[in-house]
Amino acid sequence: GGHLMKVSKEAMKDMYLRMVHIREFESKAQSLFADGKIPGFVHLYLGEEAVATGVCACLRDDDYITSTHRGHGHIVAKGGDLKFMMAELFGKATGYCKGKGGSMHIADRDKGILGANGIVGAGHNIAVGAGLSASYRGTDQVCVCFFGDASTNQGTFHESLNMAAIW
């Protein structure tokens, strides 16, 4: 049999609340986009809340993540601010990227969120670079690269695996 990780009730409650926050944020974004109130595009993370929450629950604040065009859930799970995120979706200067990044380009380096990316497969090499940086600096930080299956046929996926394997 496998080994089960013991998770405290407090940690389980925190993970549950993060999943709820992701679902509520995405549901609100979906509604506002459908009503034509959010400009541009919105790619949702509905139904995948547990993935980002479980992964990010194992990370420290100084660990890194890279994300995809469906990155809202990753940002929330890593501790992103919902108000800054929604402001970014609306193109407001109070958003994470001063309203210039929109839904697919949210970043918060202070929280280790190296950015979501609208280009399929563009986060792989950024994640490897963050991992290599941690290694060179002698820290025990990690970088998690969230990606979808469509990105595995991109050159950056294979190049990043190769780079990670050889250093």
Feature locations, PLM:
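Short, Lys/Arg-enriched N-terminal segments with co-localized hydrophobic residues
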Residues: G1-L4
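Structural motif
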Residues: K6-A11
